[in-house]
A protein has these predicted regions:
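Short acidic-glycine motifs
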Residues: 1-289
């Protein structure tokens, strides 16, 4: 089902009468969307090496000859297959009748959940320095998080996104006369977008590849993506990225009312910085086909 909760509040008032004022606000969103889904897993016969349901011959890659009775000895399974088939907590057996030529399509029913959390708030202060000078300062902070879709199987991996943002601004208005007003402003903003795979079950960790017989280091939790032909692939490429945008703005504007003419003088300088990390299309953990 779908559920969304939005909540928050505002509060403000004077700190010093006719001189100093403040305002704060907060808004939060929690969104959940869940329901049933199906996927395909290897049946018990396949886990025992019995591939007699396949219409074509099974060829032994070591000699190019058909496998007798389409029965592969379990002793010839690689470490990844043995670890996968020997751990039903990570890779469960079918729990319903499948369909398709081999009867495995949709043979496992599970649930999914899409999760979104969002928090944002502001703090603002106004200060009247003098009849001719007014200062304003504001700080804003936000955190938008999507947790993707909760995986149907522990060995499936989905991705999540963290999007923290923050900004600050200081503004000074100076009235020189009834016809001349100056506005000066300095601001800063930062937007970060972080994409990462999620180990929903917590059973994989950073040593899953080693436990599944896959060599190489593993800097993030998860399992390398293993593509298969008849049932759903497992694991994840582990595609990760981290992008941080920083923006600095310096602004000044002088407004002068000269008889019938309105004259504006000033400038706007912006410094933009982007720092980006991307693991590549093959991800951190890679893929096996």
């Amino acid at each position: 089902g779908f559920k969304r909760n939005i909540f928050g509040g505002t509060f403000g008032g004077p700190i010093k009468r006719d001189k100093l004022f403040f305002f704060v606000n907060y808004e939060g969103t929690r969104e959940r969307n869940d329901g049933p889904t199906t996927t395909s897993v290897a049946p018990q016969a396949w886990r025992n090496g019995d591939l007699s349901a396949f219409p074509n011959n099974i060829v032994d890659p070591t000699n190019g000859q058909p496998v007798p009775g389409k029965q592969i000895p379990v002793s010839r399974f690689g470490p990844t297959a043995r670890a996968l088939f020997g751990n039903p907590a990570l890779y469960p057996l079918p729990n319903q009748v499948g369909f398709g030529p081999l009867g495995v399509n949709g043979n496992y029913a599970a649930g999914f959940a899409n999760l979104i959390n969002n928090n944002q708030g502001d703090v603002k202060v106004d200060y009247r320095l003098s009849p001719k000078d007014n200062l304003m300062a504001r700080y804003s902070n936000g955190a938008y998080e999507t947790l993707g879709s909760r995986a149907a199987l522990p060995v499936f991996m989905t991705g999540g996104t963290d999007n923290p943002t923050q900004s600050a601004v200081v503004n000074w208005n100076r009235t020189f006369s009834a016809t001349i007003v100056n506005e000066a402003r300095v601001s800063y903003s930062r937007v970060v977008i972080q994409d990462r795979p999620i180990d929903w079950s917590g059973q994989l960790g950073t040593d899953a590849n080693a436990r599944f017989g896959i060599p190489g280091g593993q800097p993030i939790a998860g399992l390398s993506n293993i593509a298969t032909g008849q049932v759903a692939g497992i694991g994840s490429l582990g595609i990760a990225s981290n992008t941080a945008d920083n923006k600095f703005i310096y602004y000044n504007n002088l407004t002068w009312q000269k008889n019938k003419h309105l004259i504006k003088l000033g400038g706007n300088f912006m410094r933009y910085q982007q720092n980006r990390y991307y693991s590549g299309n093959n991800g951190v953990l890679g893929i096996f086909r």
